[in-house]
C-alpha cells in the first residue's frame, strides 16, 4: 500500500496506521500540520496495540512525527522527513530507524522511483485474483 502526495490540514487525529498491526505501507511525501505517527497505540480507544510494522515514512512533512518499531518483529523507517520528533504515546517503546531527519533525501519520491525502475526494466506485476 502506498499513500503518496497527500495533504491533511486541521486534522482531528494523527495520520498513520490505526488499530492492530497493519503491515508494510509507504507514506511518500505526506504533508500534515498535525501528527504523523507509526507507534504503539497502547489501549487507545478499543485496544489499538501496535498500529503498524514495516512502514516507511519518506520525505514527509508534519508538525510532529512519531516513528517507533516493535521490539522483535519488524522495523519502521522515517527517512528525509521534516517535523518535530516526538516520543509517542508510550515513551518506553524503541525508536524506528531515523535517517536524514530534517533534510529530504533523493529520490524525492520512493514510490515514483520504484515504479519508474520497474517499468524501465520491463517488470510487469499481474494482480492475483482469488
Question: Where in this protein do the model-derived segments appear?
Answer:
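Right-handed parallel beta-helix
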Residues: 1-12, 21-34, 46-61
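Acidic/polar loop patches that form or flank catalytic/metal-binding clefts of enzymes
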Residues: 13-14, 34-39, 64-70
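Long terminal segments
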Residues: 42-130
Amino acid at each position: 500500500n502506498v499513500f503518496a502526495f497527500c495533504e491533511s490540514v486541521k486534522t482531528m487525529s494523527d495520520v498513520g496506521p490505526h488499530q492492530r498491526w497493519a503491515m508494510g505501507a509507504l507514506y511518500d511525501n505526506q504533508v500534515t500540520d498535525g501528527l504523523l505517527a507509526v507507534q504503539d497505540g497502547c489501549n487507545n480507544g478499543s485496544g489499538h496495540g501496535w498500529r503498524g510494522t514495516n512502514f516507511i515514512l519518506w520525505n514527509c512533512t508534519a508538525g510532529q512525527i512519531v516513528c517507533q518499531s516493535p521490539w522483535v518483529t519488524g522495523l519502521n523507517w522515517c527517512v528525509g522527513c521534516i517535523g518535530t520528533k516526538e516520543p509517542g504515546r508510550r515513551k518506553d517503546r524503541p525508536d524506528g530507524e531515523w535517517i536524514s531527519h530534517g533534510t529530504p533525501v533523493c529520490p524525492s519520491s520512493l514510490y515514483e522511483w520504484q515504479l519508474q525502475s520497474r517499468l524501465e526494466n520491463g517488470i510487469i506485476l499481474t494482480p492475483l485474483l482469488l
